[in-house]
Structures are given as C-alpha cells and as structure tokens.
C-alpha cells in the first residue's frame, strides 16, 4: 500500500461509524486550537512527514515541523505544532500518533543495534518480518535509525532457505537451479553449518546467510570464505551479543526484531486554546 492509501484506510477505520460522537458533542464546529506533538522519551524519530500528511488529509494546513526524520530527540522536545479546527485535530490525533510512534519506535530500536556494532564493518539489516501493508514505511524507519534494508519483496533477489534446499534436494542443487533460471539475480543462500558452507562456496554465491551459528562459528566461516562472498549472520542474535557477531567479521547481521518487536516510541499530543 502507498503511504496515502495507508493514511486513508486508517482514518476510515476511525470513522467507520460516520462521526466522532465525543467531539461532536463537546466541541463547537467552529472551535480552533493549537496542539503540540511532544516527545515523551529520548530516541530517534521517523514518520514525522506521515504525521504531517495525516493532518493535511483532514484539512489542517497550518503545521510547523521542528524536527526531521532521523533526528535524535529528547523528552519534552516539541516535534510538530498544528493550528486549526479542534475537531479536525482530535480526529487526526490517534492516527498520526499511531504512525509516528510506531515508526519512531523502529528507528529508535534500530539505532540501538547500530550503536552496538559501531566501529566494525558490520551493518544491521532488516528482514521481511514486517506488518502487512506497511513494509515500505517500516523499512524506511529502519534506514532512519541507521540500519540497512534487505529485500523489499521476493523479486528483489533470491534468498535460498532451508525449505528451498529441502525441496530442491540439497544446497548445490538449489543454488544451481536458481542461477540457471535467473542468471543475473543476486543470490543469497542459507547454510546451517560449515560443511554446507564448504559445499556452496565453489558455486560463487553473492551472499551466504549463516543461520543460528555462534560468533565463533561465524569467525570460522569468514576464514573459509576468504572474502569471496558477503556473509550475513542470522538467528539467535541479541543486542548483547551483536558486537561479538560483528567482530567475527561478518558483513551483516539480520535482525527481524527491528520491525516485528520494536516498542512504540511515546509521543503525546497536548492541546491548548488558540
């Protein structure tokens, strides 16, 4: 889904009954207010432009952005100020905060992983473990936190995993079938042990995914590969162990948690009279 489609769908979800009955009952139709979006915690933000687009979608045009995506913010920082119709502000509030808080949570978590491997050549990469319909914006948030994107979709590159290997009859068989069918595609192949790595290296893969290997085994894999392909560690990696994996010499660590387990970044909306 496009960003605009997501916004329209989210607002429609809130107005499924046709009207905000609380605002309708308590706020005059022509009432105006000023509202500030305020950071309730420290972190890295993403989604400020989406929050802005939500406000625009309900007709709010007097909007000031004080920060930009990728900025480090602190508790109490005012991120956005909006002036306009009070009912419209409250209609947009939850949808804007949902997007803004979710994406800033991803950016903030990603920045912590990136900090954990700082000073090494290792990059933190995301996965396709994203919220259905929100992959593009979630992967954008990863970039804002300093991370790197893996595939956006199944056509971007080949990633031969254990089920493909089982179906094809082995590591080499799976690789050669993909290479034959898509000779120009980037191919990454998953291996569970060093024996599989030794088997696939002569096929000259672009990348090899080291699945659930310890940092020590990853270091051995790096020595075996001798720089002939990129190596990515995946599975069983915590933020506490990330540096050990990075220091093993792998090029990437794949972290599904960046998008599937990021806590929401706390942002509040404070309304005040005009």
Per-region residue spans from a language model:
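Acidic/glycine-rich phosphate/pyrophosphate-binding loops and surrounding catalytic core
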Residues: 1-203, 207, 216-224, 230-232, ...
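Short secondary-structure boundary segments
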Residues: 212, 235, 257-258
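Cytosolic regulatory modules rich in charged/polar residues
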Residues: 234-235, 253, 270
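Cys/His-rich Zn2+-binding cysteine-cluster or related metal-binding knuckle/ribbon modules and their
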Residues: 239
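Short, charged, intrinsically disordered terminal tails
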Residues: 257-274
């Amino acid at each position: 889904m496009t960003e605009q489609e997501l916004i329209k769908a989210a607002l429609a979800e809130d107005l499924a009954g046709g009207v905000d009955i609380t605002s309708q009952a308590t706020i005059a139709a022509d009432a105006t207010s000023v509202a500030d979006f305020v950071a309730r915690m420290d972190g890295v933000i993403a989604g400020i432009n989406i929050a802005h687009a939500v406000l625009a979608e309900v007709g709010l045009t007097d909007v000031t952005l004080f920060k930009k995506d990728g900025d480090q913010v602190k508790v109490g920082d005012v991120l956005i100020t909006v002036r306009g119709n009070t009912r419209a502000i409250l209609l947009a509030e939850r949808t804007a905060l949902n997007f803004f808080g979710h994406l800033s949570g991803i950016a903030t978590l990603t920045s912590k992983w990136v900090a954990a491997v700082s000073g090494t050549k290792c990059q933190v990469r995301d996965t396709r473990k994203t919220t259905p319909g929100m992959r593009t914006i979630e992967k954008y948030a990863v970039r804002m936190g300093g991370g790197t994107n893996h595939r956006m979709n199944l056509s971007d590159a080949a990633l031969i995993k254990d089920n493909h290997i089982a179906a094809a009859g082995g590591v080499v068989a799976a690789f050669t079938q993909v290479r034959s069918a898509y000779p120009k595609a980037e191919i990454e192949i998953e291996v569970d042990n060093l024996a599989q790595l030794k088997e696939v290296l002569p096929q000259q893969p672009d990348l090899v995914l080291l699945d659930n290997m310890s940092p020590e085994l990853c270091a051995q894999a790096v020595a075996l590969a001798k720089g002939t392909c990129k190596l990515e560690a995946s599975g069983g990696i915590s933020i506490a162990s990330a540096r050990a994996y990075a220091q093993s010499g792998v090029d990437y660590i794949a972290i599904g948690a960046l998008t599937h387990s990021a806590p929401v970044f706390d942002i509040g909306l404070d309304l005040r009279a005009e």
